[in-house]
């Protein structure tokens, strides 16, 4: 099998892995609720924490990050040393992220991508991920508003990706695209922030 065909198959697998809706699955199995019907209706860690407590929220956060981390690590191992390996590994990362936002299992209606994006940066640009985590902690600590922390951390991750790789590397542009999509998915949160109506967590 050619490396490019293998890369394409890994991209498809990355999308399917990213599509696993851990928030919905654990909500039903552990909490007995569909998290899409409570709180904000989002399937991510913050809304799961609202429905089932902080421990459940942390578990979903870890799993949503892992569903990007695992496909990326597999792609690195399988494609390491082959032509275009960097491109395909980055494509697998983006596919996992897109899977979370548009999961085939939920009619393409998914989450906002913060945890999955963090998982991607943790593997491809660890220092950027660290900057994002610090940014989240500081912004959330000052405001007690989850979306402010998430957006701050996302912006720092994207900036850190460019600082790590420069403007010509696929990871830099993938990171920027991921950050822009996260901001788009938070557009209602941003509107509420502007109006002073965003809830504290």
Curated annotation (Swiss-Prot):
Protein name: Glycerol-3-phosphate acyltransferase
Species per Swiss-Prot/TrEMBL record: Anaeromyxobacter dehalogenans (strain 2CP-1 / ATCC BAA-258)
Record gene name: plsY
Keywords noted in UniProt: Cell inner membrane, Cell membrane, Lipid biosynthesis, Lipid metabolism, Membrane, Phospholipid biosynthesis, Phospholipid metabolism, Transferase, Transmembrane, Transmembrane helix
Bilayer topology annotation: Multi-pass membrane protein
Associated pathway: Lipid metabolism; phospholipid metabolism
GO BP term, example: phospholipid biosynthetic process
Class of this enzyme: transferase
Matching Pfam families: G3P_acyltransf
Chief localization: membrane
